[in-house]
Amino acid sequence: MAACRLCCLCPCLRPLGCGPLGRPGRNRALSYLQMRALWSSTGSRAVTVDLGHRKLEISSGKLARFADGCAVIQSGDTAVMVTAVSKTKASPSQFMPLVVDYRQKAAAAGRIPTNYLRREIGSSDREVLTSRVIDRSIRPLFPAGYFYDTQVLCNLLAVDGINEPDILAVNGASVALSLSDIPWNGPVGAVRIGMIDGECVVNPTRREMSSSTLNLVVAGAPKSQIVMLEASAENILQQDFCHAIKVGVKYTQQIIQGIQQLVKEIGVAKRTPQKIFTPSAEIVKYTKIIAMEKLYAVFTDYEHDKVSRDEAVNKIRLDTEEHLKEKFPEVDQFEIIESFNIVAKEVFRSIILNEYKRCDGRDLTSLRNISCEVDMFKTLHGSALFQRGQTQVLCTVTFDSLESSIKSDQIITAINGVKDKNFMLHYEFPPYATNETGKVTGVNRRELGHGALAEKALCPVIPKDFPFTIRVTSEVLESNGSSSMASACGGSLALMDAGVPISSAVAGVAVGLVTKTNPEKGEIEDYRLLTDILGIEDYNGDMDFKIAGTNKGITALQADIKLPGVPIKIIMEAIQQASVAKKEILQIMNKTISKPRASRKENGPVVETVKVPLSKRAKFVGPGGYHLKKLQAETGVTISQVDEETFSIFAPTPTAMHEARDFITEICRDDQEQQLEFGAVYTATITEIRDTGVMVKLYPNMTAVLLHNSQLDQRKIKHPTALGLEVGQEIQVKYFGRDPADGRMRLSRKVLQSPATTALKTLNDRSSIVMGEPVSQSSNSNP
């Protein structure tokens, strides 16, 4: 049976091979499904790509056959299924409506979700970040003007805890799109490169990654071109980084060849879209006549800032659109808008390519004016304001106890290997940063991605044994390009202001790219690299290449490329140009603060450890943790147990620590403890009667201890009342020291009933030791 593509539940079902249904477009849909069913009946197709000591298995044709494209990528026992579907009706949006969702299923790790509903809810940070990597790898290869809703879903089928699934998902998206009829100029291949003992490792295992100084993801296109880069590193040298990129590109070509082989075997025909949303040459030509000179005047007026330039361009836009509507009354509104965008972009880029000048008057390698300020607010643990041109970022540092670190549940640990972390950076981009209005609730994907990049930049310089959880917040107050790298700079300043002993200061910069392409060959003929790009240069350019690091090396990198591929040569030049700019920025930052404060601020938190002997642990904790809860409620401290006798105390202020110290001294004070002598007999007072025994005290300020039923009498009893014992009654007990396992006091009344000479001691007079005859205690009388 076959159904139309719009709905597999359509009631109009016909056996394959039957006559037409008499509906427009039905014959085409039926033949499409017939072809797909015939292909799938032959079984799935698969290829294996050898990546040195790793193998990548690519298969299709067995699962999700109604989707436009589907692929299963497997490495070891980790498998990811990726589907790609695109509508045949154009979207009303004026951009490429691509949605990528990567989902990690608990079942893939053999687990059940731990939330209340016991099912997957929402997307984790890791899922969002992986989705962004996939999106940035495949988006540049869609044809210009293809405005059709397209969805790529990545479903984790199985994870073995050895091979990482995110790289498989990127390759799976490439295969699914390549095998579909969706217009896409792929394929791409992706690998992860690690560096262990100076050697590059392709697609390292989770254990290998734990000892790697580099985590580099490379997405490559045919002809050894680069589509996407993302990396975090332990401050590795520039030459090592460049070598790792070249190794990654080499192995991406092997994956691309495997995908191309599979596509050739299956024989894929791409669909012809109903319409590609690009304006006609006639409209573009007329737009140039109207607006080109005006735009040139605006883009070469170096007195403009972001606001005034945008206002001038918008004024030209409105005037141009009015003329175009009069000249072409029947043309779609989108074509009019897009024609102006094309002309504005062309003028902007030609000034850079031909005159080596930028719209703010800088040359290609100059930085914007930079100013730094630290210790903005005295009550904060650390703060800094970083201003670069019209991009302004306020960063703060907050310390808390290690109990406040980000905890990973069993499922996340099983799938990603992510453990607790005590350093985090949260990035906020409020609407007012660009003079707009909008919602400020929640964190969107862009904020999450920018914050993760800045966190990667700073994480390698944070000491591993720092006794606090560190939270850096970065709030963008003004934005005109490269706010994520400004966050890395501001975060570094704030950490030093807070007294965090970072190994080195960190700075970041964004490098842009403007190219001139041969229309016949599709190759780059000429290009310009721009240091420290503006927002308008990012919008009209071909690449946003962000790099961060110290004076010594690189800690983070991210390349967002709009072209279907960039040669390695350009990437290498961008890294070199960014490294020079990074050192210039560090010199400016060092003028404000060059090293961390020698000590944290006076109002900062304090961490101390206290030793509590096993004998006093019960008193320190209290019944049901009463003393600890009271201590934390009254002083605001956080207490965590390090080992059997050691407790770590975090206090938000030195005053709180002083109060906590006095509280602990008071509850643990026991000035008569040392008088107890092993084997001596003491008079104890019953304070409570329980089913299991009686609670007794040997002296007034002592914590009551349990005298078990088995130690009350030679006879076996089930309840203390059988012996006539009452609260307030005094009995004689023999002291046998403390249990070495839990520190509890060991007392016995039973042994005193045996005929033996005993020494009766009193705690009221230290010198009094009464030697007596064998003690005989009545079960129903006071001793």
UniProtKB/Swiss-Prot annotation:
Residues carrying Phosphoserine: S754
Annotated transit peptide: 1-45
Chain ranges of the S1 motif domain: 679-750
Compartments reported by the entry: Cytoplasm; Mitochondrion matrix; Mitochondrion intermembrane space
PTM annotation (N6-succinyllysine): residues: K552
Keywords: Acetylation, Cytoplasm, Exonuclease, Hydrolase, Membrane, Mitochondrion, mRNA processing, Nuclease, Nucleotidyltransferase, Phosphoprotein, RNA-binding, Transferase, Transit peptide, Transport
PROSITE patterns: KH_TYPE_1 (PS50084), S1 (PS50126)
InterPro entries according to UniProt: ExoRNase_PH_dom1 (IPR001247), ExoRNase_PH_dom2 (IPR015847), ExoRNase_PH_dom2_sf (IPR036345), KH_dom (IPR004087), KH_dom_type_1 (IPR004088), KH_dom_type_1_sf (IPR036612), NA-bd_OB-fold (IPR012340), PNPase (IPR012162)
Protein name: Polyribonucleotide nucleotidyltransferase 1, mitochondrial
Organism this protein belongs to: Mus musculus (Mouse)
Gene it is expressed from: Pnpt1
